[in-house]
Amino acid sequence: MLDDFKIDLLVKNKPPTSTTAVVAMSGGVDSSVAAALLHKLGYKVIGITLQLYNNNKNSNTKGACCGSLDTKDAKQVASSMGFPHYTLNYEKVFREEVIEDFIDTYTQGKTPIPCIKCNQVIKFRDLLNATKSLGADVLVTGHYIRKIEQDDDIYVYSSKDTKKDQSYFLFATTVEQLRLLRFPLGNFHKEDIRKLAKYFNLQVANKPDSQNICFVTDTYKKTIAELRPHTIKKGNIIDINGNILSQHNGIVNFTIGQRKGIGISSKAPLYVIKLNPDTNEVTVGPKSALLQNKLYIREINWLAKEKIPHNGLNVKVKLRSSHSGSPATIFPNNNNTATILLQDSYCTVTPGQACVIYDHDRMLGGGWIC
């Protein structure tokens, strides 16, 4: 069975028995298999699970991750395989840098992706520092993404399992972080990972994939109302000409492109076109007013060695994780920003989301949509 799951050495020219690998264990099947596989291959595995919020509150939320039951699952996997496991409490920094950012972004009329922020400031910053302090050689995760090192250059590619590819969520990972990160599952398919979990007799073998944001116990609005109630205020819903159509109970209830749940009867479908936090107004209109072929991104993390030429670079862009990608041209601007011009399509542009840039299946970098 293990002959079908060959991976490159985690550290070049260093045998597994001399290599210490910290594995970030969420309690799910992917990170559990990554840890178990490396342990079976002879690596010195240390499992670490991060406690990021009040686990008891969300422990039984269907489809959520990182709850107290997930921590127990991770510990059980480590115990059954015979490698050490530790839980690190990062609740304070998670609240300050992920949850507060999530609320800030929503109240600004944007749509956040807290999982990317968590990867950026918790897993691939603080957990990497913990990895170094333990004297470990690498930090391993169960993400479906491929990384190739040639000489001193690093290339990142989408997973062979395109349905499970997670490169979109890792665009903000820096080159220096990537030097210590390893993704052993990137060349495999999810169904094969579940088979391996059963081969190892892991109790998480049939555990469903997490789909919800870990700290959201019900709805986004309810979470924001609990943590920052004063930010939810009534306001006007207007059309594209500024005419008042109705009232809303807070712009946090809306996202650009939304059609359902607007609460207005109309002969033609209405979509959320704009959210204005300054006036607390929600603008709605026809789909034609929603579609764009130009967008701007900020805080670009560029992984490719080649710079973006001033006359533009033809690329493929993904504007959401489920997006298959659209051909586009990227033009560099000042202050680590860029303009993206879609070549043959119009789409919904949602501020706060990520725009991730590819050359075929190679991830070049990305940025946040303005």
Curated annotation (Swiss-Prot):
Sequence positions that bind ATP: 24-31, 50, 142
Active site: 118 (nucleophile), 214 (cysteine persulfide intermediate)
Catalytic activity: S-sulfanyl-L-cysteinyl-[protein] + uridine(34) in tRNA + AH2 + ATP = 2-thiouridine(34) in tRNA + L-cysteinyl-[protein] + A + AMP + diphosphate + H(+)
Site keyed Interaction with tRNA: positions: 143, 353
InterPro entries: MnmA-like, MnmA-like_C, MnmA-like_central, MnmA-like_central_sf, Rossmann-like_a/b/a_fold
Disulfide bonds: 118-214
UniProt-annotated location(s): Cytoplasm
Biological process annotations from GO: tRNA wobble position uridine thiolation
Enzyme Commission code: 2.8.1.13
GO cellular component: cytoplasm
Region span, Interaction with tRNA: 164-166
Pfam family, one: tRNA_Me_trans_C
Organism domain of life: Bacteria
Presence of the UniProt keyword Phosphoprotein in the record: no
Predominant cellular place of this UniProt entry's protein: cytoplasm
Key words of the record: ATP-binding, Cytoplasm, Disulfide bond, Nucleotide-binding, RNA-binding, Transferase, tRNA processing, tRNA-binding
NCBIfam families (alphabetical): PRK00143.1 (NF001138), trmU (TIGR00420)
Known role: Catalyzes the 2-thiolation of uridine at the wobble position (U34) of tRNA, leading to the formation of s(2)U34.
Annotated family: Belongs to the MnmA/TRMU family.
Name of the protein in its database record: tRNA-specific 2-thiouridylase MnmA
Gene name linked to the record: mnmA
